[in-house]
């Protein structure tokens, strides 16, 4: 049965000039932007008592926004007994270490077998929290740390912290090619113009900022550490492809196998057989949404990336780095 919700909030003075769809995304952060926009277009949003359906309507600050809508029962998602690697847990949050080949949220082509289905099994009460408490996502084959909220207040505050860029997320990756230095990619990301399942750097896309630094050089690859300011879909993968240094194994974004000259058959087979993007969410730091305590978590790099790193390092020690280094 659908749940009737009526929520009210006031537009902040700092939101002066924002589009209505942007303003309500900040005011009602428990819900996804797509869901809020759907409600807006369906006449479920009132501004000072008047129904407004145009997303581009500007707000001035001080308006009272009322949201009257039906929230579909999230029990339509099946609770499934799927193991979770719990790094930390208390009454308000859970931090998990996600393995590869594990989708975070049900969607087209993946109706179950996801992190969300597992959460509903291990924490039945989390069904009362929008999106079962999921605050941010990792791609199916990206491994590493995610924080999940157990309660609506915890989720609301974590989502706001994410929007304000107060959650630090660091990643370890192996990029193809010789990167000489670190830097920053500040390029907007939007849906790919022809490949609708992929993203791309796009002038009219959403702002996206990725910081990166070189951790270790190999002959034809580079181990890097990255930090996200924003969290767009496939952000690191898109930005590294934009730099012409796609991630090892990421064939969707140009990560074709590159074999160092004279490489052993073992290394050649490992590179050609690495069948996921070499990307791991290694560190997560944020203020606890309820207590305010600063928390920091680390997840060890998974075995497949460790083995690849060791093999590339051995190859580099044998042949040496190119003269440019």
UniProtKB/Swiss-Prot annotation:
Q: Which residues form the S4 RNA-binding domain?
A: 18-91
InterPro entries (alphabetical) = PsdUridine_synth_cat_dom_sf, PsdUridine_synth_RluA-like_CS, PsdUridine_synth_RluC/D, PsdUridine_synth_RsuA/RluA, RluA_PseudoU_synthase, S4_RNA-bd, S4_RNA-bd_sf
Q: Entry's Gene3D superfamilies?
A: Pseudouridine synthase (3.30.2350.10), RNA-binding S4 domain (3.10.290.10)
Gene Ontology biological-process annotations: enzyme-directed rRNA pseudouridine synthesis
What UniProt keywords are attached to this protein's entry?
A: Cytoplasm, Isomerase, RNA-binding, rRNA processing
* Top-level EC class: isomerase
Has UniProt tagged this entry with the keyword rRNA processing? yes
The GO terms this record gives for MF are: 23S rRNA pseudouridine(1911/1915/1917) synthase activity; RNA binding
Q: What is its EC number?
A: 5.4.99.23
Organism domain of life? Bacteria
Location in the cell: Cytoplasm
Q: Where is the active site?
A: 139
A Gene Ontology term for the protein's cellular component: cytoplasm
Q: Which reaction does it catalyse?
A: uridine(1911/1915/1917) in 23S rRNA = pseudouridine(1911/1915/1917) in 23S rRNA
In UniProt terms, what function does this protein have? Responsible for synthesis of pseudouridine from uracil at positions 1911, 1915 and 1917 in 23S ribosomal RNA.
Tell me the protein family, please. Belongs to the pseudouridine synthase RluA family.
Tell me what this protein is called. Ribosomal large subunit pseudouridine synthase D
Q: Which source organism does the UniProt entry give?
A: Vibrio parahaemolyticus serotype O3:K6 (strain RIMD 2210633)
Q: What is the lineage of its organism?
A: Bacteria, Pseudomonadati, Pseudomonadota, Gammaproteobacteria, Vibrionales
